[in-house]
Amino acid sequence: MNIIQAIIIGVVQGLTEFLPVSSSAHLVFIQNILGVESSLAFDTFLHLGSLLAVLWFFRADIIKMIVSWISSLSDIVHGRFKEGFHEDPYKRFAWYVILATIPVGLVGVFFEDSVDALFSGALYVPAFFLFVTGTILYLSQRMTSGNINFHNVGPKESLFMGLGQACAILPGLSRSGTTIAAGLVIGLDKEFAAKFSFILSIPAILGAFLLQVKDIGSAMDANFLPIILGFIAAFIAGYAAIKWMLELIQKRSLDIFAYYCWAVGIIVFMGSIAHIF
C-alpha cells in the first residue's frame, strides 16, 4: 500500500465511521477499487484514529461522564446510589451508555465467526445491507422528532439504541445510521439521537481496537509511514464528519444519505453479480 492509497482509505474510514453510510461496506468497496488489502496494523490504527476523533470532539462530556461514573461507584459503597443517579444526568448517561453497549458486546462474543464469514464473502452481501441502511434512514426521516433528550432519556431508549448498534455488526449496515434511526423511532430528539449515537460508538470502536491490538505484534508493517498517514487522515475526517452530522441533522433531512446508500448498494450489488467487481 502506498501513501496515497493509505490517505484515501483513512479518509473513507473517518468519514463513513460517523456518516450514516456504513464504514464496513465502504472499506470493502474502496480496497477492491484500489486493488489493495490493508494489514492488521493499518486497520488497527484506522480504528484508533476514529476513536480519538470522537473522544476529542466530545471530550468535555466524556470527562464529566467518567468523573460522575466514578462518583456513582462511591455512591454504591455509601448506600446513596439511587439519589445520586437521579440527581446527576451525567451519572445516568454513563450507566445508560454501558447498558446500551451490552447487546453489541454479546453479539461480538457469540457471533464473531459468523460475522467474519460475511465480511470475507462476495461484495453483494455488504451491498445488500447498504441498501437496507438506506431504507432504514429513509423511513426514520418520516418520523416526527421526539422530545426525549439528555435529561430525560431512560433505560428503555438506551437499550433500544444498543440493539440498533448490535444489528449494525452486519457488513453494510451503518452503525450511526441504525442507532440514530433507532433513537428517532423510540422518541429521541434528533440532535440528541446523533450525540448518543456518536458517544455510544466509543466502547464499540474501543472494543474493536483492543481485539486487533492484541494480535498486532508480528503483523506490524516495516513501512510505518502509510499507517501514520492513514491514522491522521481517519482522525481528521472523523472529526469533520461528526461536526457536519450534528449540524446537518438539526437543519436538514438525512434523505440524501438514504439515496446515496441505495445508489451505491444497487451499483455494487449488480456489479458483484455480473463479476465486474
Model-flagged regions — what are they?
Residues 1-277:
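Multi-pass membrane proteins that catalyze or facilitate reactions on polyprenyl-/lipid-phosphate substrates
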